[in-house]
């Protein structure tokens, strides 16, 4: 049978108990077993890196997934819900390097690759176990006994199979490409792995000497270290360029001083004598005047420099270079500038640059900024490399994997590139080729794992030719269902549209080895697709497919030569890219692929360029389609002010701290309901606390009827809804109808992954409909001692409402739902499903859904709220009854609602009578005040206007209004004569008497009669007395069924007499066998003094 819940809500003990229940009953396995063979729902988990403890964003991610999976399971779906773990790549390597104190790849080589990869494996597996425990404490149900792990051989085979497909479909290419490169990790990294942050860098303007004439091309760069690799200059064919003859400011200033120019003449003054800045152009004019035209000409011939700059940018560049004056010698188009030859500015220091031909090419990527020309180093830039391919420019890349120059750069050989910047700038300055230098702060790419600034290198890499599949990929993006739609139609579509060929090779150790063997003799390739294929070809078992073990495998080539595996491993994003078929154990098993593609994936919005993209690319390679049908994108978790959480800011909120303080259910319901999944979530302890209070209210609503049900031995198996149908009150029908509407809403929202709306709908139902309305209406019915049909109807409705609500909230707050279910259902029937999560999802019962009643009750509640507001104005507590309320309706819907629900409204407003006035019907209890219109009365009545106005104000407003409505006029009688008052000469204002209090609501006004009769006063004091006795019962920890005897001293004879008239009513309400009203204070039992509305009372209670 149902048990009473005596304890207050405690998340810690409740959740621990439910965890133990699930473990002991094997609830997860039984739940999944129940749905085997049903309609299918294939979910693929985006695998987190096993690099440490989970954070709030990871927790939110898994909570969303778990809630959707629980909902789908209750809706009858057979699920695939394997959790995934990303256990390879730089995320793991960098952590292990830090633990071991390594700084470079050389440290790893000296330590030993086998030992290093073993350390990585242990680190990844250890963290996986820790993170699994954390996820379980969030109530996440997944197939934790069989996760997919990217380090397992069967998973590695899924990646090998995919790359073999790429090879067979001519989508796998190797060649020189310009890639993002991390010099610390010494590997290529993908565009999606580049993290941008503000950084200060050198900003320099450099003069490149023309080869065949006097003058310079001027370029700008923020990477001085790329100057040694310069192979060309790019201009824009649509720009106009100018060759200017520029005179350095220092030369002109020195000549002016030698000419005897008094510097005081270079200062202007305000009218009051104060100095003011002189424009530099005016200073230049004065200096030239002082020097003389011939001398200026001589200065130009001796010191002038001929510079080629985009015409519109000349002034800015010359200001940067501190040139005082210039003349435009000629202009040219970009097309005319094409082919212009120049000499490398550091050719004397870099031997190979002496022998290289350098000239100007045209490129559309050159923009009208800085100088209008771009220095081209095909070895160190994507656009540069592409221009080099087009024009046949050599991709000279003198930088090694560790970010140091090689020996080909002469004077800079062996230097770290950024440490070489000052020397390069100084060498340019000594050659008078550094036009200007400063520093700028700009967004610059960094390695996603070690945070080192990236560089661009041209290296030999393995690529998947995304460019060959792009149109098909974009078509698939359109086919997939995106939640929200713009995540796919805008953000992801744009990313795919701009994507380059995918560099899938990495020069590291801990990852999936690229399964390509190359013949050392003839150079032919063999791409291996499975472990079995490799073992068949090598003739022995290969137990571990990682480095260095797989590196030791040699294959025999058809030419007789020996084939060695290429050293590279896969980009770690390629690991997770194959997750949707690796989850299904493919290619080892083919029978599960009819589940594919995934019905649902959900990850953060950063995955538009991460996992969403890599999966799409791999899916197109393997199967020619996207590996998912539905994608939901969620936001990031931020602090309360909207800032990113970071340890350095001290604003990190750990999920385990929230669980410890408020419970897993609170954290779950908070992150699900706070905002739409695709919006960023700014975590607030206060808002999270509000959700905890909502859960507490739900717990108390659940606890409320239990003592009465236990006392009355209520048996839901015997007291069915059908058996009490004839005793249902309108509020019973309403709460059941409202519940159907909530089921309908939740289903609608869950279909589009609007979990915030689904959870808010349930929370609102619990707080507003169930707790603050229905329970208040039903409370007194549960106190009836007799075996009353009305009470049983309330029990049954409460029971059904609670059980259904428990099922509705179960996917979102699984712990409290389970605890309530076990008491309300399992304690009633041992045949019921072991867990609430095994139950079928509630289905809308159309016979219970009454939309009109729902609308009427919404109106009734607004009327009750308005009545409460009016009472507050009159300082009349709700506990004190009023004779009546009058509802002045503004539309017919309000009239209908009041008539149909007058009993509910009367009970909730504590009024003896509820009166409704139809739209336009006058409230005769209101006074009517005449408001004369002076704009009409003055001009019409002129000299007597004041007396007419005074007469109107003194007249009976109701009579004036009636006369105008019926006779179209009202006649004012004054000594000067009779005057007709027409409708537009006056308006009317209601006058609320002191006996009424008024408040508005959407749909009309509510007037509360606050007149206090003797009978109402007696009831008011009696209700005050009852409340205090009930409080004392609670303090004595009495059970509902405990009987008491009461003695009451009332320190006012009048009030004593009033309470005596309702003594029997009070005794019944507090379950007192005797209630004696005395003139002396009680001494026996639990005695307490009270102040009741200014009247001293002393109450004594004794349990019988």
UniProtKB/Swiss-Prot annotation:
This is Isoleucine--tRNA ligase. Catalyzes the attachment of isoleucine to tRNA(Ile). As IleRS can inadvertently accommodate and process structurally similar amino acids such as valine, to avoid such errors it has two additional distinct tRNA(Ile)-dependent editing activities. One activity is designated as 'pretransfer' editing and involves the hydrolysis of activated Val-AMP. The other activity is designated 'posttransfer' editing and involves deacylation of mischarged Val-tRNA(Ile). GO terms for cellular component: cytoplasm. InterPro entries: aa-tRNA-synth_I_CS, aa-tRNA-synth_Ia, Anticodon_Ile_ABEc, Ile-tRNA-ligase, Ile-tRNA-ligase_type2, M/V/L/I-tRNA-synth_anticd-bd, Rossmann-like_a/b/a_fold, tRNAsynth_Ia_anticodon-bd. SUPFAM superfamilies: Anticodon-binding domain of a subclass of class I aminoacyl-tRNA synthetases (SSF47323), Nucleotidylyl transferase (SSF52374), ValRS/IleRS/LeuRS editing domain (SSF50677). NCBIfam families: ileS (TIGR00392). One of its GO terms (biological process) is isoleucyl-tRNA aminoacylation. Its EC number is 6.1.1.5. Pfam families: Anticodon_1, DUF5915, tRNA-synt_1. Its main location: cytoplasm. One of its GO terms (molecular function) is isoleucine-tRNA ligase activity. Its cofactor is Zn(2+). PROSITE patterns: AA_TRNA_LIGASE_I (PS00178). A motif ('HIGH' region) lies at residues 48-58. It comes from the Archaea. Belongs to the class-I aminoacyl-tRNA synthetase family. IleS type 2 subfamily. It comes from Methanocella arvoryzae (strain DSM 22066 / NBRC 105507 / MRE50). The gene is ileS.
């Amino acid at each position: 049978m149902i048990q009473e819940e005596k304890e207050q809500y405690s998340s810690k003990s409740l959740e621990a108990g439910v965890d133990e229940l699930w473990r002991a009953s094997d609830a997860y396995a039984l739940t999944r077993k129940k749905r085997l063979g049903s309609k299918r729902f294939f979910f693929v988990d985006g695998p987190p890196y096993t690099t440490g403890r989970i954070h709030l964003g990871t927790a939110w991610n898994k909570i969303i997934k778990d809630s959707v999976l629980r909902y789908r399971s209750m809706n009858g779906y057979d699920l695939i819900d394997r959790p995934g773990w990303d256990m390879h790549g730089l995320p793991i390597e960098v952590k292990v390097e830090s633990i071991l104190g390594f700084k470079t790849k050389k440290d790893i080589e000296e330590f030993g690759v086998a030992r290093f990869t073993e350390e990585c494996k242990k680190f990844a597996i250890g963290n996986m176990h820790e993170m699994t425990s954390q996820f379980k404490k969030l109530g996440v149900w997944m197939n934790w006994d069989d996760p997919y792990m990217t380090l397992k051989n069967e998973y590695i085979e899924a990646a090998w199979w995919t790359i073999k497909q790429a090879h067979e479909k001519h989508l796998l290419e190797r060649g020189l490409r310009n890639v993002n490169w991390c010099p610390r990790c010494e590997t290529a990294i993908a565009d999606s792995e580049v993290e941008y942050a503000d950084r200060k860098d050198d900003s320099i303007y450099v003069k490149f000497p023309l080869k065949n004439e006097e003058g310079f091309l001027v370029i700008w760069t923020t990477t001085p270290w790329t100057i040694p690799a310069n192979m060309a200059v790019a201009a824009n064919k649509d720009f106009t360029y100018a060759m200017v003859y520029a005179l350095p400011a220092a030369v002109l200033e020195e000549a002016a001083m030698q000419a005897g120019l008094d510097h005081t003449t270079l200062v202007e003054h305000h009218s009051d004598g104060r100095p003011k800045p002189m424009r530099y152009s005016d200073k230049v004019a004065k200096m030239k005047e002082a020097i003389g035209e011939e001398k200026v000409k001589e200065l130009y011939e001796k010191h002038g420099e001929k510079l080629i700059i985009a015409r519109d940018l000349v002034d800015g560049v010359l200001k940067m270079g501190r040139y005082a004056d210039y003349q435009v010698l000629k202009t040219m188009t970009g097309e005319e500038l094409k082919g212009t030859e120049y000499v490398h500015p550091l050719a004397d220091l870099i031997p190979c640059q002496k022998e290289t031909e350098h000239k100007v090419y045209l490129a559309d990527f050159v923009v009208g900024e800085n100088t209008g020309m771009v220095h081209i180093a095909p070895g160190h830039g994507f656009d540069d490399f592409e221009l080099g391919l087009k024009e046949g420019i050599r991709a000279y890349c003198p930088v090694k994997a560790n970010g140091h120059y090689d020996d080909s750069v002469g004077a800079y050989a062996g230097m770290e590139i950024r440490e070489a910047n000052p020397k390069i700038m100084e060498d340019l300055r000594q050659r008078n080729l550094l036009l200007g230098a400063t520093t700028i702060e700009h967004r610059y790419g960094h390695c996603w794992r070690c945070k080192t600034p990236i560089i661009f290198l041209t290296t030999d890499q393995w690529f998947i030719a995304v460019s060959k599949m792009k149109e098909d990929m974009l078509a698939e993006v359109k086919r997939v269902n995106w939640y929200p739609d713009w995540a796919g139609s805008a953000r992801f579509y744009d990313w795919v549209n701009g994507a380059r060929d995918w560099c899938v090779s990495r020069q590291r150790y801990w990852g999936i080895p690229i399964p390509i063997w190359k013949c050392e003799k003839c150079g032919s390739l063999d791409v291996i697709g499975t472990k079995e294929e490799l073992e068949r070809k090598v003739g022995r078992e290969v137990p571990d497919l990682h480095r260095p073990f797989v590196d030791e495998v040699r294959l025999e080539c058809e030419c007789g030569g020996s084939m060695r595996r290429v050293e590279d491993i896969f980009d770690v994003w390629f690991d997770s890219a194959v997750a949707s078929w690796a989850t299904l154990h493919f290619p080892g098993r083919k029978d599960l692929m009819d589940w594919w593609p995934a019905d649902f994936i959900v990850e953060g919005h950063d995955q538009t360029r991460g996992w969403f993209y890599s999966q799409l690319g791999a899916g197109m390679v393997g199967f020619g389609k996207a590996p998912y049908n539905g994608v939901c994108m969620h936001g990031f978790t931020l602090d309360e002010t909207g800032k990113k959480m970071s340890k350095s800011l001290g604003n990190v909120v750990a999920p385990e701290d929230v669980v410890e303080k408020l419970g897993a259910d609170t954290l779950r319901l908070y992150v699900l309901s706070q905002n739409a999944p695709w919006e960023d979530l700014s975590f607030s302890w206060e808002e999270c606390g509000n959700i905890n209070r909502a859960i507490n209210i739900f717990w108390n609503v659940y606890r409320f009827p239990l003592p009465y049900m236990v006392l009355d031995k209520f048996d839901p198996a015997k007291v069915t809804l059908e058996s009490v149908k004839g005793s249902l009150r309108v509020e019973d029908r309403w709460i059941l109808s409202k519940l159907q509407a909530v089921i309908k809403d939740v289903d609608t929202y869950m279909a589009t992954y609007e979990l915030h709306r689904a959870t808010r709908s349930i929370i609102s139902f619990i707080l507003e409909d169930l707790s603050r309305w229905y329970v208040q209406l039903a409370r007194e019915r549960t106190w009836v001692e007799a075996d009353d049909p009305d009470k049983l109807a309330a029990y049954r409705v409460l029971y059904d409402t609670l059980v259904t609500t428990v099922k509705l909230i179960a996917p979102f707050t699984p712990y409290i739902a389970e605890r309530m279910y076990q008491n309300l259902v399992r304690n009633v029937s041992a045949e019921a499903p072991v867990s609430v999560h095994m139950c079928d999802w509630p289905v809308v019962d159309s016979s219970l859904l009454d939309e009109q009643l729902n609308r009427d009750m919404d109106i009734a509640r607004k009327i009750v709220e308005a009545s409460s507001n009016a009472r507050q104005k009159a300082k009349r507590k709700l506990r004190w009854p009023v004779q009546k309320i009058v509802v002045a309706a503004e539309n017919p819907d309000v009239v209908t609602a009041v008539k149909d629900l007058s009993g509910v409204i009367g009970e909730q407003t504590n009024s003896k009578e509820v009166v409704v006035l139809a739209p336009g019907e006058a409230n005769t209890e209101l006074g009517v005040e005449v408001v004369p219109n002076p704009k009409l009365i003055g001009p019409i009545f002129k000299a007597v206007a004041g007396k007419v106005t005074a007469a109107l104000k003194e007249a009976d407003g109701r009579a004036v209004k009636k006369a105008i409505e019926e006779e179209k006029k009202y006649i004012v009688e004054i000594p000067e004569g009779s005057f007709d008052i027409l409708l537009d000469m006056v308006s009317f204002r209601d006058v609320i008497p002191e006996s009424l209090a008024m408040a508005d609501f959407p749909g009309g006004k509510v007037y509360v009669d606050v007149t206090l009769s003797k009978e109402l006063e007696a009831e008011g004091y009696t209700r005050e007395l009852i409340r205090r006795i009930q409080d004392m019962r609670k303090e004595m920890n009495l059970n509902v069924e405990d009987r008491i005897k009461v003695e009451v001293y009332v320190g006012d004879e009048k009030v004593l007499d009033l309470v005596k008239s309702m003594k029997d009513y009070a005794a019944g309400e507090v379950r007192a066998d005797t209630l004696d009203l005395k003139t002396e204070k009680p001494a026996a039992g639990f005695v307490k003094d009270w102040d009741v509305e200014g009247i001293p009372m002393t109450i004594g209670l004794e349990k019988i």
